[in-house]
Every structure is written in C-alpha cells, then in structure tokens.
Design a protein with these regions (language model features):
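A short glycine-rich, Lys/Arg-flanked "PGG" loop and its adjoining helix->strand segment in the class I
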Residues: 194-206
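A short acidic, Gly/Pro-enriched loop at the edge of an enzyme's catalytic core
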Residues: 171-179
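Class I (Rossmann-like) S-adenosyl-L-methionine-dependent methyltransferase catalytic domain
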Residues: 14, 83-109, 115, 121-171, ...
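Short, conserved beta-strand element in jelly-roll/cupin
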Residues: 25-35
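Short acidic-glycine-tyrosine-enriched beta hairpin
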Residues: 42-62
C-alpha cells in the first residue's frame, strides 16, 4: 500500500468502513499522529485512540467498523493487510479459496510429493506448495495452468505444472505421497473412472494418501446438475477396500455455482481421505 499524508489519506478511510471477512489490517505511522475511532454498526464511537509512531498499534479485526482522521499536519502512514494462508491466494489473485478438506487434511500429510489431479488455477496446489510440499499440478485446461504458472512465478513457488487428460489414466512422475482430487471426478467420463482410480492408487506410495471430493446422486438426493459422473452410495468406498479410511462421509454440501435464484446449489458429496 502507498504512504499517505494528512492531505492524501483516502476519503473512504475517513468515513465509517470495515475490513473484509478473513482480512486483518495493520496501520503503521511513520510521522505525525492519527486518530482511530472504533465504531458500532450504527456509526457510534465506542472508543477513540491517538496513534503515533511510538504507539503499539493493534491489528484491526475482520469486519470491525472504524474510521480514521489525521491528528497532525505532518502525518505519514500506510496500511498492511493480512489473512490466513488458506485465504492468501484467493484474496490476492481472485482464486476460489483452498478446499476445506485440503486444509483439514494437510497436517497429517507426509511432507513429500503431492499430486493435484485436476488442479485448475491452483487453489490447492499453491496452498500446499507454500506449506513446503513438492507439488505437481495436472489439468486439461491450458488457460488455468497458465494462470497457475504466473502466480507460482510471482510467489517464487516451484510447482511442476503439466497439461493432462485425467481420462487417459496415465499419471506421470512415479509415486506420490499424496494425491488429491477435489470436485473433479464428476467431470470425467464415467466409463474411465475404474481406470482413473486404479491409476491414482498405483501411483500412491505405501503409506500415502488419496483425498477425493466428488458429486453424488442417490435415491434420496438425486444430483441436480447433469455431471458426466456421479457416485452412488458406497461406490467410492468400495474402490478403496483394503485402504485405511481416515475420513469418509456422504454429506450435503454446496457448489460455488448458483441456481436461477442466485442460491448456491446444494447436493450430496462423497468425501474420502484414504491411506494406502
């Protein structure tokens, strides 16, 4: 962010506003003084603080209402925004947020080779690479891979990015400690699914993990979207007979896609974290 003076401090910051969900702000004073007002949602002042460069200025919490005003003519200050690692790439590069199942499973993944099968623009690949994993990203969409490559270069992340058709069931690169495929297999030709899953399994190192999230269609909850492939109840679990299931459920979830009323589409998903 730029350095502002008493004259150039943006008008929106002088008025009531708040930080976004998942975003923290920190104010740094280089010279002079600034008045910070804590507000309620109606604009009433809850507290007033005078900050200088000697002040220990706290972070502004997400969605906290506030406003500021110069308290001296020689004011020089700037703002820095912060977020959690799982939100970083989404906020900075306008990507979809890292999948919640990837975030949850990451602490138990062995630090090694990760294959993101159907990576798209890299919402999961970038997060895992930033966490120190050796990531390979495969996807059929060249435009998505190009954006991923640009972000990886800008962030100084070494990600192996390759075009790949999942239906070929011919994963490159030997064995992986982790293979993830989140919200991808529903777009695959259903006749290739047995080969695709067998290929994932055969390229998973002993003790390694497969994390899959995919659409379902069941008698009690037919899939509202015409995906090429939807899993029946228990189908994915059967493919992984003999593996250790650390997580398996067939719960309802939401797509980012919306219906004609603007509501996110609800449907049943199979979520599985299996260890070889």
């Amino acid at each position: 962010m730029p350095t502002w003076t008493a004259e150039t401090l943006p008008e929106p910051f002088r008025k009531m506003h708040n930080t976004k969900v998942g975003t923290w702000a920190h104010l740094t004073i280089l010279e002079g003084a600034l008045t910070f007002y804590e507000l309620d949602e109606n604009g009433n002042v809850l507290a007033q603080h005078l900050f200088t460069k000697e002040s220990e200025i706290p972070f502004v919490e997400p969605q906290a209402w506030h406003r500021v005003s110069p308290a001296s003519d020689d004011l020089k200050c700037y703002l820095t925004f912060y977020c959690t690692p799982e939100d970083y790439f989404a906020k900075k590069y306008d990507l979809t947020r890292t999948h919640s199942e990837v975030i949850e499973a990451t602490p138990i993944f062995p630090k090694g080779k990760v294959l993101d099968l159907g990576s798209g623009e890299g919402r999961n690949s970038l997060y895992l690479a930033k966490k120190g994993f050796d990531v390979t990203s495969l996807d059929i969409n060249s435009m998505s891979l190009a954006k991923l490559a640009q972000i990886a270069e800008a962030e100084g992340l070494d990600i192996n990015i390759q075009p790949y058709n999942i239906e070929s069931a011919d994963i490159p690169g030997g064995l992986y400690d982790v293979i993830i495929s989140t919200v991808v297999l529903m777009f695959v030709d259903p006749y290739t699914i047995p080969d695709v899953i067998e290929n994932m399994q055969s390229h998973t190192a002993p003790g390694g993990f497969n994390l899959i999230v995919a659409a379902m269609s069941t008698e009690d909850a037919p899939c509202p979207v015409n995906f090429p492939k939807t899993f029946a109840s228990g189908e994915l679990k059967d493919y992984y007979a003999g593996w250790t299931l650390h997580k398996y459920n067939e719960d309802f979830g939401q797509l980012h896609k919306t219906d004609e009323n603007g509501n996110r589409i609800k449907m049943r998903f199979v979520t599985m974290l299996a260890q070889k």
